[in-house]
Amino acid sequence: MPDEKLPQYNEVWNDLEKGCLHSCPSYSVNNHVNNPIVKQNSTLTQPSLRKKNTMAAPARLRKRSENVRLTQARYAIFHIFLPFILTLLLYHNFYNYFDQALADLNSVVKYVIETIVLIFTYVMTVIIVYFSFSLIKLAFEEAYVYAPSVAKANEGLAKAIAGLAKYVAKAIQGLAHIILSLLLFILGLEVIEQDEETGDVEMSSMRGQAITTEPASDNTMAEETDCNTSKDVESGSN
């Protein structure tokens, strides 16, 4: 109904009643949109009431996440996986390639080199495990990006998937920390075992030297007694 306090609104109302909002030359759509009363309540001028493009944001996020994954994959290939493979080859063929080279070195130096290679191998293993879990975590965290398109803009399902992904990501992160702790524990055990083996080798080498020196002394004593007896026999015959 027309309102006496709002003359501009009354003008629009009259035009609407006449049915000449778009046809009357005295009034145009621009005047209708620029009207302060209509502008305040119009869906054309309020951004919050406009039709939102629901596919723009997920597509942009998907593209950004794909770029992030490509960058991480390249970093993993050139900075993690290739050095790890080379380290494994070095570690498994360590004695074959470097046994002769390290034969003349001190046992302490050899033990230090072996320990460094072992620690580096386990560090690279931990990095690969943690990186793999990080990729899985990233995939679960990005589930909410794909949820609207899969659920056809069903907000309930999207929130459920996002919440589940959040807890799964936390669980994966905790599992990665547990694996890291176990690997470090195994590393400590192997270092201790390697130290014991080097100690046993040193003790066995010392025992071998002692065993080889004792028969030599017995032989020299036997030779001396034989020489003395032969001298006595010669003197008696004379």
Swiss-Prot record:
Signal peptide: none annotated. It comes from the Eukaryota. It is found in: Membrane. It is a multi-pass membrane protein. One of its GO terms (cellular component) is membrane. Residues 206-220 have a biased composition (Polar residues). The chain crosses the membrane at residues 75-95, 116-136, 172-192. Residues 229-238 have a biased composition (Basic and acidic residues). This is Uncharacterized membrane protein C1682.06. It comes from Schizosaccharomyces pombe (strain 972 / ATCC 24843).
